[in-house]
Amino acid sequence: MRHFLTLNDLDKNEILDILSLAKDIKKEAKSRNYISYLKDQTLAMIFEKSSTRTRVSFEVGIHQLGGKGLFLSSRDIQLGRGEPVKDTARVLGRMVDMIMARVYKQSDLEELAKFSGVPVINGLSDDFHPVQLMSDLLTLSELGLNLQTMKVAYVGDGNNMTNSWLMAASKLGFELRVATPKGYEVPQWVLDIAKQNSKISCANLIITDNPKAAISGADVVTTDTWVSMGQEDEKEKRINDFAGYCVDDDMMSLAAKDAKFLHCLPAYRGYEVSEAVFEAHAGEIFSEAENRLHAQKAVMVWCDRKRYE
């Protein structure tokens, strides 16, 4: 059985296979030709963290695949009242066909995968956001980027998105420049994994605290909010610490001609990205948001097909 907890669990060909499947599924959806790949299956959707895009895309996605989504907030189930994760996993695994969880701790996802007996998908954790990366990669591929030779600049907080970009780059082999302020760097354990993967993929990983150097000549520029869920008390300090990291017109002018800009949303204009840059690249950003639906449908179908491996 295969789970989808982090891109580090997949090899290059598996990532590309899921993206190819996503393109096929998207083409079917655009022609209103919905194929019931997961007919009568139930997806349990555990939400410790609230979300717009994750809930809508998974709930619509499983419906379009012929199944049903079951929304479970931490207030609705015993997991939010102190029940061990492994007990929740063993109960759900006897009643549903697949689990998607959007949680704080990556270890909770690993526990669900270990004890549930059904495929588990990471809808987001504090460490990784792999379904968002699949959406980003799908979007860039549709925009004509070569996923193995492109140059990507990530500017901002060293968070779950940064970690996921490092996993993607180190598996596929593209160049990734990561610019974070001092004190907000990528965890060393994540860098160690990425560097080890890069011995095979030959990915060029550049870590810096200079956002302009990172963006210079980049084919793709991406960022994320400076204040993630649960960090609201740090907002004022973070805004001060991230001074000089706003992706504005001056910053984008350093990138390659016709460079793309992505943002996983929600975006806070005037902070991590300027209003002008956001609106100039709104088509790319909202295609990226839509592609959460198609990429995640592909992930669910892939997990189902790998159920007995």
From Swiss-Prot:
- GO CC terms on record? cytoplasm; intracellular membrane-bounded organelle
Q: Where in the cell is it found?
A: Cytoplasm
Gene Ontology MF: a single term: ornithine carbamoyltransferase activity
Per UniProt, the enzyme's principal EC class comes to transferase
Q: Which Pfam families match?
A: OTCace (PF00185), OTCace_N (PF02729)
Q: Which GO terms describe its biological process?
A: arginine biosynthetic process via ornithine; citrulline biosynthetic process; L-arginine biosynthetic process
Q: Which reaction(s) does the protein catalyse, per the Swiss-Prot or TrEMBL entry?
A: carbamoyl phosphate + L-ornithine = L-citrulline + phosphate + H(+)
Residues that bind carbamoyl phosphate: S51, T52, R53, T54, Q78, R102, H129, P130, V131, Q132, C264, L265, R292
Q: What is its EC number?
A: 2.1.3.3
Q: Which UniProt keywords apply?
A: Amino-acid biosynthesis, Arginine biosynthesis, Cytoplasm, Transferase
Pathway, according to UniProt?
Answer: Amino-acid biosynthesis; L-arginine biosynthesis; L-arginine from L-ornithine and carbamoyl phosphate: step 1/3
- Keyword Transferase found: yes
Where does the chain bind L-ornithine?
A: N160, D224, S228, M229
Tell me yes or no: is Ligase among this UniProt entry's keywords: no
Enumerate the Gene3D superfamilies for this protein. Aspartate/ornithine carbamoyltransferase
* Domain of life from the UniProt record: Bacteria
User: What family does this belong to?
Assistant: Belongs to the aspartate/ornithine carbamoyltransferase superfamily. OTCase family.
The protein's job, in short, is: Reversibly catalyzes the transfer of the carbamoyl group from carbamoyl phosphate (CP) to the N(epsilon) atom of ornithine (ORN) to produce L-citrulline.
Name the UniProt record assigns to this protein: Ornithine carbamoyltransferase
